[in-house]
Design a protein with these regions (language model features):
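Single conserved hydrophobic/aromatic residue that forms the stacking wall/gate
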Residues: 2-12
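Short, surface-exposed ligand-recognition loops at beta-strand->loop->(often short) alpha-helix junctions
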Residues: 1, 96-108
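Short amphipathic alpha-helices within nucleic acid-binding modules
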Residues: 37-49, 149-161
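Long compositionally biased, domain-poor regions of proteins
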Residues: 118-122, 146-152
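Short hydrophobic/aromatic beta-strand micro-patches
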Residues: 32-34, 96, 144-146
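Glycine-rich beta-strand-turn "strand-cap" elements at beta-sheet edges
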Residues: 13-30, 53-89, 123-142, 164-194
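Short glycine-/aliphatic-rich beta-strand segments at the starts of folded cytosolic domains
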Residues: 89-96
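Extracytoplasmic/secreted envelope proteins and their assembly/folding machinery
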Residues: 42-45, 55-58, 107-114, 154-157, ...
Length: 194
């Protein structure tokens, strides 16, 4: 059963395991679905909750949900590839906007940074995730940096140090938000429109 295929919608589905995380015992994995828009997300959810085959599959999962969070994800840039089978790395950082900075202002500056980074050879994808129902933290947004392969994150860090740190686009982000509490997850892309 595949909710994405049945709805004829583009979605990306990942199963990510915590790797660098402050509490590895808190959960075994994080299931991530990315939909093109809210209408597709909730059509997929309707199929998942109403379809007897989906319910039977859900009952067979080796784990129970401990938390489900609905989010809005603002795509900033894409990694080199999002093909199914890629073993990806995703780094999430909780961020609080500093006084006087709107989420839109931060987004626009981050888009400028990511565009410049990719024009200069960076292969990492970036998103801003705005948590909604089910979220119990106090972050204004979650900053996601993700790669098509685990090793690409290390290459991306070195590229940032040598090529991106001293750019005007990176300096424009300084002081807009405080981001910390980083966690890194790894896992396969299970389903992709590619």
């Amino acid at each position: 059963h595949d909710t994405c295929r049945r709805q004829r919608q583009m979605c990306i589905r990942d199963s990510l395991q915590p790797y660098f995380h402050r509490d590895l015992a808190s959960h075994d994995f994080m299931w991530v679905n990315n939909w093109p828009d809210s209408a597709a997300q909730f059509k997929g959810l309707e199929v998942w909750t109403k379809d007897p085959k989906a319910n039977a599959l859900f009952a067979k999962l080796p784990a129970k949900n401990s938390q489900v969070v609905s989010t809005v994800q603002w795509a900033i840039s894409q990694p080199r590839s999002t093909d199914a089978g890629n073993f990806i790395l995703a780094q999430y950082n909780s961020c609080k906007l500093n006084e006087g900075t709107s989420l839109r202002t931060y987004y626009d500056a981050y888009v400028d940074f990511a565009k410049m980074a990719q024009e200069n050879g960076d292969v990492q994808g970036r998103k801003l995730i705005i948590p909604g129902p089910g979220y119990d933290g106090d972050a204004d947004f979650i900053r996601l940096v993700y790669t098509s392969a685990v090793s690409e994150r290390g290459e991306g860090i070195e590229f940032w140090r040598s090529e991106l740190r001293d750019t005007d686009e990176r300096r424009a982000l300084v002081g807009m938000a405080d981001c910390g509490n980083g966690s890194i997850y790894v896992g396969p892309v299970l389903r992709s429109p590619n």
